[in-house]
């Protein structure tokens, strides 16, 4: 957090049918519906999150990610980072407070990889869902589905990874936690963090700009991941891979698709990092084991199905 960017705050996803998407994210993943707006967007959050929302669903003709937002420490920090982005050569769009319900002024920019990100300082504080602030119980007893704990990260595909890396590290204060290096020594995947997490956002090289691989939600235990797999089967939800373990980050994971084809992940565990740790490096020739630690064989669908 050396530049004042604290954490992932929200992601806006495009879905083909709002009600079927809502049934997926609310009833299967277990997010809580918090609000709707005049544009028809639906706002959701996981139960441990203290701000009003972390996921926004927007009905559209094509699936994918509109943007990902990061929360900064205060308005002064937002102003400073805005100027830093301008000085770096980024084009800036300022979105007024209230355009997302309960969210303050947002500053949006596009990365060299073709993805849109935004920074904001203020969002309505609603507290952890279903718990009192004083003497809180361990968890709410009326959670649904997979009982997602928090929105954790996004994995994105695009080109110009080195330029994107420079923007995130030099301007926004991220650090490199893990990477994949090809035979020429070129970084083809980068896992960037603001915190002790294995990653807050990750990028994999792709010749096409602005592609979305997955949005990820944290669960508490391996038993919860297995239970998520049961729910995927019970609901005939399209599965991608898992349950399994990653070599990269060592998280225990399962991947599946929402009704629009956007890939989701739920996971538990994984490595921790501090900024004095050296980046963990995997070799591209061992990518099968890096992604699927048990099978050690690449799933072509996992690499090529993007929105």
Swiss-Prot record:
Source organism: Pseudomonas sp. (strain CF600)
Cofactor dependency: Fe(2+)
Record's protein name: Metapyrocatechase
Keyword hit for Transferase: no
Binding-site residues, Fe cation: 153, 214, 265
Family: Belongs to the extradiol ring-cleavage dioxygenase family.
EC number(s) on file: 1.13.11.2
Pathway listed: Aromatic compound metabolism; benzoate degradation via hydroxylation
Annotated InterPro entries: Catechol_2-3_dOase (IPR017624), Glyas_Bleomycin-R_OHBP_Dase (IPR029068), Glyas_Fos-R_dOase_dom (IPR004360), VOC (IPR037523), Xdiol_ring_cleave_dOase_1/2 (IPR000486), XylE-like_N (IPR054560)
Subunit structure: Homotetramer.
Gene, per the UniProt record: dmpB
Keyword Repeat in annotation: yes
Domain VOC: 7-122, 150-269
Keywords: Aromatic hydrocarbons catabolism, Dioxygenase, Iron, Metal-binding, Oxidoreductase, Plasmid, Repeat
Family matches, as SUPFAM superfamilies: Glyoxalase/Bleomycin resistance protein/Dihydroxybiphenyl dioxygenase
Top EC category: oxidoreductase
NCBIfam families (UniProt xref): catechol_2_3
Molecular-function GO terms, alphabetical: catechol 2,3-dioxygenase activity; ferrous iron binding
Record-level GO BP terms: benzoate catabolic process via hydroxylation
Catalytic activity entry: catechol + O2 = (2Z,4E)-2-hydroxy-6-oxohexa-2,4-dienoate + H(+)
């Amino acid at each position: 957090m050396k530049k004042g960017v604290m954490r992932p705050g929200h992601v806006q996803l495009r879905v083909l049918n709002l009600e079927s998407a809502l049934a997926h994210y609310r009833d299967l993943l277990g997010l809580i519906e918090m609000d709707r707006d005049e544009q028809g967007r639906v706002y959701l959050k996981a139960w441990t999150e203290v701000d009003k929302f972390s996921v926004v669903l927007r009905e559209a003709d094509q699936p994918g990610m509109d943007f990902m937002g990061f929360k900064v420490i205060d308005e002064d920090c937002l102003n400073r980072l805005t100027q830093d982005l301008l000085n770096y050569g980024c084009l800036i769009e300022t979105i007024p407070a209230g355009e997302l319900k309960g969210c303050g002024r947002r500053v949006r920019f596009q990365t060299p990889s073709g993805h849109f990100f935004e920074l904001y300082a203020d969002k309505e504080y609603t507290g952890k869902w279903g718990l009192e602030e004083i003497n809180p119980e361990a968890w709410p007893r009326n959670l649904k589905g997979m009982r997602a704990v928090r929105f954790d990260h996004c994995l994105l595909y695009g080109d110009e990874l080195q330029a994107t890396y420079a923007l995130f590290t030099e301007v926004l204060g991220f650090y490199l936690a893990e990477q994949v290096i090809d035979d020429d020594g070129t970084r083809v995947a980068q896992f960037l963090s603001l915190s002790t997490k294995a990653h807050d956002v990750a990028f994999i090289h792709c010749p096409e700009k602005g592609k979305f691989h997955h949005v990820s939600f944290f669960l508490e235990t391996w038993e919860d991941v297995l239970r998520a797999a049961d729910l995927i089967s019970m609901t005939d939800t399209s599965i991608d891979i898992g349950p399994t373990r990653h070599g990269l980050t060592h998280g225990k994971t399962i991947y599946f698709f929402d009704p629009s084809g956007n890939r989701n992940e739920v996971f538990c565990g994984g490595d921790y990092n501090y900024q004095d740790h050296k980046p963990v490096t995997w070799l591209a020739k061992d990518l099968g084991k890096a992604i699927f630690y048990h099978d050690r064989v690449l799933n072509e669908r996992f690499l090529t199905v993007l929105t």
